């Protein structure tokens, strides 16, 4: 047990170091790039978190109709991981900066329109009843929720001084409690599939250098990170928090783990985010239907797709 804990602590430190460096890099790029795209930001923050996206997609799936609903239900595993969007690549070998996790950051900061134009080609080839289309509909949900919530989060960072990850973490805890789940022990890692069928559904949507192996490793690493930062005991949380404090990154990084103590400064952000969460459900349904109309009729994609995730 001691050896296992020591090994996990090494993983924690490596991941802290990588995310810390990446957060500094993204902040520098963000400041340098104001006005260069629709949002003035380049991406890299992941908000809301994995459970929020999963919960959001479940609500959207209840409201779509006809073959779209049938496709989602037939391939729910692929739809479910689509709800995490390009964030899966951010976790690829997270102990070091590499082309894959930088690609995930890049996708967040550019217009999603080219991605969705390419997605039309993929789904036309695979079919409206395919696992690929189920994945894509989940991806649309991720895109909508991110792009509806991020501007508010950035605003509230400035007003409250609470960092992005902590706002995300506090919102995640609120949603879990609303659903009758324990936010400290909930196994988010179980929401991440790594099976071959899911991998095959994902990789055709990305650039030519993407391979099934990269997708599979990204999913495995995401699952690992979510497992490492699930610490249901006070002692386990204390070890991780001590490591973050030792690196001088507790304020920025503590939101990687659902903390046992709530931050009262996030009461307002939780209220603002749940309102945007609820309002975004109908938007996501409409955009899935709009994409499907473009798919079947050949009409251009709706302008709403021409936004970043930020």
Where would I find each of the regions flagged by the language model?
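Aromatic-lined, polymer-binding surfaces characteristic
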Residues: 141
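N-terminal polybasic/positive-inside topogenic patches
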Residues: 7-8
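N-terminal leader/auxiliary helical segments
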Residues: 14, 23, 28, 33-136, ...
């Amino acid at each position: 047990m001691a050896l296992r804990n020591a090994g996990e602590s090494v993983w924690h430190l490596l991941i802290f170091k990588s995310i810390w460096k990446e957060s500094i890099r993204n902040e520098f790029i963000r400041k340098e790039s104001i006005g260069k795209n629709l949002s003035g930001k380049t991406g890299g923050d992941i908000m809301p978190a994995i459970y929020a996206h999963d919960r959001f997609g479940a609500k959207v799936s209840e409201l779509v109709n006809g073959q779209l609903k049938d496709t989602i239900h037939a391939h729910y595993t692929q739809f479910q991981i689509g709800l995490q969007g390009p964030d899966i690549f951010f976790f690829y070998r997270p102990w070091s900066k590499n082309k894959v996790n930088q690609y995930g950051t890049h996708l967040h900061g550019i217009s999603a329109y080219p991605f969705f134009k390419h997605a039309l080609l993929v789904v036309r080839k695979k079919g409206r009843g395919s696992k690929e289309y189920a994945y894509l509909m989940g991806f649309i949900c991720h895109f909508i929720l991110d792009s509806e919530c991020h501007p508010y989060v950035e605003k509230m960072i400035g007003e409250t001084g609470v960092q992005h990850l902590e706002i995300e973490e506090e919102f995640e805890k609120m949603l879990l409690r609303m659903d009758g789940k324990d936010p400290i022990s909930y196994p988010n890692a179980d929401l991440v599939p790594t099976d071959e069928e899911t991998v095959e559904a994902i990789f055709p949507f990305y650039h030519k250098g993407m391979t099934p192996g990269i997708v599979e490793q990204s999913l495995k690493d995401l699952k690992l990170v979510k497992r490492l930062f699930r610490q249901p005991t006070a002692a386990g949380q204390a070890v991780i928090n001590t490591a973050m404090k030792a690196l001088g990154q507790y304020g920025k990084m503590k939101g990687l783990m659902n903390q046992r103590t709530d931050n009262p400064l996030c009461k307002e952000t939780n209220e603002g985010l749940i309102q945007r969460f609820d309002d975004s459900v109908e938007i996501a349904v409409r955009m899935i239907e709009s994409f499907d109309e473009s798919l079947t009729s050949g009409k251009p994609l709706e302008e709403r797709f021409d936004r970043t995730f930020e």
